[in-house]
Amino acid sequence: MNKGYPITDLVILAGGQARRMNGLNKLLQQFDGDTQLLKIHQKLKSSVSEIWVNSHRDYSIYQSIVPDIKCFQDDASGFFGPLMGMKSAWSHVRADYVLFIPCDVTYIPTQVVAKLHSALRKNKQAQAAYVSINGDALYPFCLLKRESLEVLEQQIDKQQLSLKNCFKLLHAQVAIFQKQNLFFHSINSLDELQQYKQIKAFKEIFSTN
């Protein structure tokens, strides 16, 4: 089926240490009823070709939830953040475009892949486009071209792991989205997860009254 943009793979970034989650794997947590893995898969499976998880653990659990999921680890041991996951992805994916998404997002905009491709096309030099929700830049929620690999490698070699600075070198474009009543666009700790669930429960009670 012609989607109006080039073949694009999806990589879910789940390679962090989860220190603020007491070691819990965020991709296997339920923010909205389903596990994050299932939620992300269901939302984006029709928009992408292959789906990968960048993670160092729980492969068998991922595959029990989504049997055709593919997995890979960072090229280097240790925890170097999303930049290393993005760099490592290009050794595995076959597509020349990859949508990266953090494992802890709460909101996945409709038509996000198409809109990121549209943003990317606005500048011929651009090798990246990222999502902004309600004015907040979500740099790990982004679309990269394969040509970005050289810059990713250079930044890692220099131990310059900031996505924001790297994206400046990639002439990154932005796809802007708005979402009312979005209190957390991502969950970074157990405290935030508890707050998110409490707010969600309150909204559900309020909406039924």
Swiss-Prot record:
GO terms for biological process: bis(molybdopterin guanine dinucleotide)molybdenum biosynthetic process. The keyword S-adenosyl-L-methionine does not apply. Its cofactor is Mg(2+). GO terms for cellular component: cytoplasm. It is found in: Cytoplasm. Mg(2+) binds at residue 104. Transmembrane segments: none annotated. The keyword Nucleotide-binding applies. GTP binds at residues 13-15, 26, 54, 74, 104. CDD domains: MobA (cd02503). It catalyses: Mo-molybdopterin + GTP + H(+) = Mo-molybdopterin guanine dinucleotide + diphosphate. The N-terminal domain determines nucleotide recognition and specific binding, while the C-terminal domain determines the specific binding to the target protein. Monomer. Belongs to the MobA family. Transfers a GMP moiety from GTP to Mo-molybdopterin (Mo-MPT) cofactor (Moco or molybdenum cofactor) to form Mo-molybdopterin guanine dinucleotide (Mo-MGD) cofactor. This is Molybdenum cofactor guanylyltransferase. It comes from Acinetobacter baumannii (strain ACICU). The gene is mobA.
